[in-house]
Amino acid sequence: MLELAILGFLRDRPLHGYDLRRRIAALMGHVRPVADGTLYPAIKRMEASGRLIRKDEPGIAAAPRRTLYLTPEGRAELERRLRDPDDLDISDENRWFVLLAFLRHLDEPGDQAAVLRRRLTFLEEPTSFFYDDGDRPMGAEEFGDPFRQGLLTIAHATSQAELAWLRATIEALERGETGAGAGTGADAGAGAGAGAGAGPGPGPGEDAGAGE
């Protein structure tokens, strides 16, 4: 998840290490704090593998600042991860948010739609945070306390909103509408706050009580 975020933000634009950390923290810091001891070793590994390079550039003060750039190898790796994500990238909500933040960097609407369809298929499976003795998913109406009712009601509403968005976006992409494409890097930081504001989310039980 961290390497995908690094690749994605550097695909948006070259960044200094501090700026990269700030963007990653906004996108996924609510899941796991982005510490220097995690980020910079990852950057070094990716530099050693040829996926990014560092260039010294003049800073505001006397000391030069190192700017990170994605290489062609890094761009190819990003596109591979976006086009063929792991199953966990589809099913885990937090990993999905990171993937979704950079899906615009796939050039083909058909490739974008294929990834969204995998998420749609996952969400359409009946699931819940709670099951009865027969392993049947339980809905909010089956609980007498307001807390489990609230958990399942919120999860259901979140899931229904995502399902509606997925279906509409897949339909638009399959019609060849390319407005969801990569665009420019001008709004590179725009999506970061969205992930943070969404919070951890309901996780694997997000379609709880759908009753579909």
Report residues per predicted region.
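Basic helix-turn-helix/winged-helix DNA-binding cores
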Residues: 1-92
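Amphipathic alpha-helical coiled-coil segments and their boundaries
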Residues: 109, 116, 145-148, 152, ...
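Acidic interhelical loop/turn segments
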Residues: 131-151, 181
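Long, low-complexity, charge-rich intrinsically disordered regions
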Residues: 152-176, 207-212
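Small-residue-biased low-complexity repeat regions
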Residues: 179-211
